[in-house]
UniProtKB/Swiss-Prot annotation:
Residues reported in the UniProt entry to bind ATP: 265-267, 534, 583-586
Protein name as it appears in the record: Aspartate--tRNA ligase, mitochondrial
Record organism: Mus musculus
Annotated stretches, region: Aspartate: 243-246
Binding positions for L-aspartate per the UniProt entry: 265, 541
Stored SUPFAM superfamilies: Class II aaRS and biotin synthetases (SSF55681), GAD domain-like (SSF55261), Nucleic acid-binding proteins (SSF50249)
Source organism phylogeny: Eukaryota, Metazoa, Chordata, Craniata, Vertebrata
Keyword Transit peptide: yes
Cited function: Catalyzes the attachment of aspartate to tRNA(Asp) in a two-step reaction: aspartate is first activated by ATP to form Asp-AMP and then transferred to the acceptor end of tRNA(Asp).
InterPro entries: Aa-tRNA-synt_II, aa-tRNA-synth_II, aa-tRNA-synth_II/BPL/LPL, Asp-tRNA-ligase_1, Asp-tRNA-ligase_1_N, Asp/Asn-tRNA-synth_IIb, AspRS_core, GAD-like_sf
Top-rank taxon: Eukaryota
Gene name as annotated: Dars2
Pfam families given in the database record: GAD, tRNA-synt_2, tRNA_anti-codon
Alphabetized UniProt keyword annotations: Aminoacyl-tRNA synthetase, ATP-binding, Ligase, Membrane, Mitochondrion, Nucleotide-binding, Phosphoprotein, Protein biosynthesis, Transit peptide
Length: 653
């Protein structure tokens, strides 16, 4: 059933003869991806085959064909299924003595061996058709066969329903890529990128420009990979984004820039992050925030797969403050409710000391979420897990309140809740018989963040018990805007750091606060969120050199010498400009429903940042390091140096 599902998506639309005008082979994945005058790609041009395995139909009966592919499986030495990236076709193994050599090749070749066969397209015997297979009405009566390459014993079966560990899949990635799931993911990714390029360059005049991947270290942001140079003590860095280059392109008058950009971040072990990733990078001159948003909405509409429901634009928008107050996060999953409600007024006269203490503070508040049908799905141990989670991760207390079947309040704290408070809480939160209320108190941001986490934990628990909250077929986009421009540093709360990056322009109405209360300034930044995942972030940039220098030097205490090239460029008539970067890996992962971004990247790294197939990163000999004036200090060497009071370094030049 699973294989048939993917085959139908993979091979849909292949029944017409090649050369006629129609949707391309993968156009069945998207209503928007097919140009009205586009012809089917000639998949068999320039190669030693006449057809692909997935395109043959009853309309080809009697035709002589040559096919190349992998042996998917074989049954009773009577027939086998041949597979290529376009689909499957049944091959009838000849049984007569005159074709003994052909039979020997096809019967003795191991599964996943590569063969080329030639023969005639014939109908399957009545009753033996396979309606789940796009080529299920026909089979190939083979006349000649050639073993192109035999396959040795496989480390795992190449079938989507066969479970493999991720480590094994990454070690033998070239085999894992043969699966229909990976074929579908990568081809859909390719087609979405093609349509994005078409939308931006052909329809809206963007210029596709490659920017350098060898750059210099920049202040702030994520850690960067260093690349040694032949100058002693000097290093390049791999850019975490083309941010500075695309701004410089606007100074250079390119007006509209686009790139499928490779980016790099040395973030260590992150379960679902990659040290190298791809983003759709965009920058425009003379644009405001709404212009970028409308462009991106049109871009996604144009490139959206046709087997999904069409996108409705414009996407809804929400301020950062609203997102935090309602969902407890700046990237809310709006597919389900369970919104945060401020119930401070309900408990102004409460006898609960925990709530009294919170409300007595200037920023104190009481917040709650209602888990609809929670009593139906959640168990006692689930409630205990939620309470321990709050204490362990937030040092906060959570009060579970629920109604039993007789509509009597049942809670460890029930005796402290007055009748008026119960009725008002039930009214304000629209509590039903099987609902559970999770209530907490404290400083606004901390209380909201806690309930935002519990909201997702409860959704996980409910879905684990059989409830349906987050429909995977629903794609809920949301713009989040009006972020704070600066945040207090965790290690030094009196100092500021950029909430996103130091090139974001402040809201025009907040510029005066830069010189008096910079922590209150909002930035012209906007994030695009899909189903609780940030898939894009952008901003209107600072194009005034004096303002950029003030923010870097005075507010952020950064060394402006590192950005002297950018500051100098802004002094030479930089236009107003803004842009955005969309995370391609994350976007395709969500569109395909893949469990990890590693399932939509051809050759990803493991969660530890390693290439399990090639064993990268690898050691380098001292002779190879010599031109770079680098000497490696191994851990034992570092310990010895520490003992002798010499500062240890992993790299010395």
């Amino acid at each position: 059933m699973y294989l048939g599902f993917w085959l139908s998506r993979l091979c849909r639309g292949l029944s017409r003869p090649i050369g006629k005008t129609m949707r391309p082979i993968w156009g069945s994945l998207s209503r928007n991806l097919a140009l009205s005058s586009q012809r089917i790609p000639e998949f068999s041009s320039f190669v030693a085959r006449t057809n692909t395995c997935g395109e043959l139909r009853s309309s080809h009966l009697g035709q002589e064909v040559t096919l190349c592919g992998w042996i998917q499986y074989r049954r009773q030495n009577t027939f086998l299924v041949l597979r290529d990236c376009h689909g499957l076709v049944q091959i009838l193994i000849p049984q007569d003595e005159s074709a003994a050599s052909v039979r020997r090749i096809l019967c003795e070749a191991p599964v996943e061996s590569v063969v080329r066969v030639s023969g005639t397209v014939i109908s399957r015997p009545p009753g033996q058709e396979n309606p789940k297979m796009p080529t299920g009405e026909i089979e190939i009566k083979v006349k000649t066969a050639e073993l192109l390459n035999a396959c040795k014993k496989l480390p795992f079966e190449i079938k989507d329903f066969v479970k493999k560990t991720e480590a094994l899949r990454l070690q033998y990635r070239y085999l894992d890529l043969r699966s229909f799931q990976m074929q579908y993911n990568l081809r859909l990714r390719s087609q979405m990128v093609m349509k994005m390029r078409e939308y931006l360059c052909n329809l809206h005049g963007f210029v596709d420009i490659e920017t350098p991947t060898l750059f210099k270290r920049t202040p702030g942001g994520a850690k960067e990979f260093l690349v040694p140079s032949r100058e002693p003590g000097k290093f390049y860095s791999l850019p975490q984004s083309p941010q500075q280059f695309k701004q410089l392109l606007m100074v250079g008058g390119l007006d509209r820039y686009f790139q499928v950009a490779r980016c790099y971040r040395d973030e260590g072990s992150r379960p679902d992050r990659q040290p190298e990733f791809t983003q759709i990078d965009i920058e425009m001159s003379f644009v405001e925030q709404t212009g970028i948003q409308r462009l991106v909405e049109g871009l996604l509409q144009y490139s959206w797969p046709g087997d999904k429901d069409p996108l409705v634009t414009p996407f809804p928008s929400m301020t950062f403050a609203e997102a935090l107050a309602t969902y407890g996060t700046d990237k809310p999953d709006t597919r389900f409710g369970m919104k945060i409600v401020d119930v401070s007024d309900v408990f102004r006269n409460t006898e609960l000391r925990f709530l009294q203490d919170a409300l007595a503070k200037p920023q104190g508040t009481v917040k709650a979420i209602c888990v609809h049908d929670g009593a139906k799905y959640l168990r006692k141990e689930d409630i205990e897990f939620i309470r321990k989670f709050a204490v362990h991760h937030f040092s906060q207390e959570v009060l579970p309140i629920f109604l039993n079947a007789k509509k009597n309040w049942s809670s460890p704290f029930a005796k402290f809740i007055m009748e008026e408070e119960r009725l008002e809480l039930a009214r304000s939160m629209e509590i039903q018989e099987e609902d559970i209320v999770l209530l907490t108190a404290g400083e606004h941001e901390k209380a909201c963040s806690l309930l935002g986490k519990l909201r997702l934990e409860c959704a996980d628990l409910l879905e684990m018990r059989g409830a349906v909250l987050r429909d995977p077929a629903v794609f809920s986009f949301l713009w989040v805007v009006d972020f704070p421009l600066f945040l207090a540093k965790e290690e030094s709360p009196t100092e500021l750091e950029s909430a996103h990056h130091p090139f974001t322009a402040p809201n025009s109405s907040d510029i005066h606060l830069l010189y008096t209360e910079p922590e209150k300034v909002r930035g012209q930044h906007y994030d695009l969120v899909l189903n609780g995942n940030e898939i894009g972030g952008g901003s209107v940039r600072i194009h005034d050199a004096q303002l950029q220098r003030y923010i870097l030097e005075t507010l952020l205490k950064e060394d402006v010498k590192l950005l002297s090239h950018l500051l100098q460029a802004l002094d030479y008539g930089a236009p107003p400009h803004g842009g955005i970067a969309l995370g391609l890996d994350r976007l395709v992962c969500l569109v395909t429903g893949a469990p990890s971004i590693r399932d939509v990247i051809a050759f990803p790294k493991s969660y530890r940042g390693q290439d399990l197939m090639s064993n990268a990163p690898d050691s380098v000999s001292p002779e190879e390091l010599k031109p770079y004036h680098i000497h490696v200090l191994w851990p034992a060497d570092s310990e010895e140096e520490s003992a002798s009071a010499t500062p240890s370094k992993h790299l010395s030049s």
